């Protein structure tokens, strides 16, 4: 459960990301594909090379979904219901991949915002991304 302080950290971070969401989302995906090559199996139709238009487009989708979630912290299941259905029933993404992408996103954010990425912010963002992952995998059961 996200505390009021966690929610403030999440909202503040997403405000600071501003127009860089798509860029950071794509960078996190590239980082995931490089660090965890088996994740590429879910994107057989993608050019997963650095700077790929497909990775950039999917990075924007990831960033937009997380921005939506950050705007609905009190109703993550409602905000992410359609994405949960998509990932569970159509795409059938292994739930461990959400943890891998979350880790890569945290590294990306820390790299771009080192001064703001305090231990407290890191912990709050980790809890937020874990909550998002839990919601996205909730319909697997």
UniProtKB/Swiss-Prot annotation:
Cellular compartments per GO CC: blood microparticle; haptoglobin-hemoglobin complex; hemoglobin complex
One Pfam family, short name: Globin
Tissue expression as described in the entry: Red blood cells.
What the protein does comes down to:
Involved in oxygen transport from the lung to the various peripheral tissues.
Task: List residues modified as Phosphothreonine.
Answer: 108, 134, 137
Q: Which family does it belong to?
A: Belongs to the globin family.
Which GO molecular-function terms appear in the entry? haptoglobin binding; heme binding; iron ion binding; organic acid binding; oxygen binding; oxygen carrier activity; peroxidase activity
The Globin domain covers 1-141
**Which species is the source of this protein?**
Spalax ehrenbergi
Name the gene behind this protein: HBA
Residues bearing Phosphoserine?
3, 35, 49, 102, 124, 131, 138
Keyword DNA-binding on entry: no
- What InterPro entries does its record include? Globin (IPR000971), Globin-like_sf (IPR009050), Globin/Proto (IPR012292), Hemoglobin_a-typ (IPR002338), Hemoglobin_oxygen_transport (IPR050056), Hemoglobin_pi (IPR002339)
What name has this protein been given in UniProt? Hemoglobin subunit alpha
């Amino acid at each position: 459960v996200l505390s009021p302080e966690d929610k403030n950290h999440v909202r503040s971070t997403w405000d600071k990301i501003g127009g860089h969401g798509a860029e950071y989302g794509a960078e996190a995906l590239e980082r995931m594909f490089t660090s965890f090559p088996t994740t590429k199996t879910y994107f057989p139709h993608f050019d997963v090379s650095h700077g790929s238009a497909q990775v950039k487009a999917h990075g924007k989708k990831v960033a937009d979904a997380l921005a939506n979630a950050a705007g609905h912290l009190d109703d993550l299941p409602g905000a992410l219901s359609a994405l949960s259905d998509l990932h569970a029933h159509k795409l059938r993404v292994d739930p461990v991949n959400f943890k891998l992408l979350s880790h890569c996103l945290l590294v990306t954010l820390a790299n771009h915002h080192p001064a703001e990425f305090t231990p407290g912010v890191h912990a709050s963002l980790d809890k937020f991304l874990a909550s998002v992952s839990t919601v996205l995998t909730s319909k697997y059961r």
